[in-house]
């Protein structure tokens, strides 16, 4: 970081704390029900009356963003763990204060070494909706109903995981425990499931959460179910969405501006014309 600062650069790290690798020491320890890390992830038993590890035994019918079930059976523990993304990326249990403390300690470690901030991967998925007994929607005995299953045979977990009930609490706690007393840092959150109106609250400096968010309505509106089946660009609708972003933060907060990222098709191919070198260059300049 020091050498970057000498060149007038700021170092913003990618921070992934909704989940870890399944090879992380925390997860390896969590496979043991008697270990202090036992409750650091979302572990659940097979549904009653089913055989663990067999189709239909998953705790609920949630599907993964990457396809298939959002639950993976772990023979060592004899239970399933939740992964909204790859089975190699088990979700951390942010309801556990020890998990949050470990995350904050890690963030402080990097800031103490000169990092200038964090781009927080899917940070708005850290708070899951549960009933009063801690059960997820659709789980056996849960008071919360799940959504209907789709064509692939799974339900959508996003309404129960995005912008969850304790998200503001967690982000404000992070701000206090990591950034209080520091100056010159940046926090920007990747925010699936967050509206422009909620962006105002989260990025309002008075609420002490994040500085900026990456919202996705403007890069999702032209897709027919999947980003790989784009519809023709509706420019008036695009302009309306972008204007809505700005209007929502006219009194407080910040809007971020981007037209694509590593999860999106390249913008020249998507909204421009790359059929020839000339049209590709013109499109790239325009976009």
What would you call each of these model-derived segments?
Residues 1-287:
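Active-site and adjacent substrate-binding regions of carbohydrate-active enzymes
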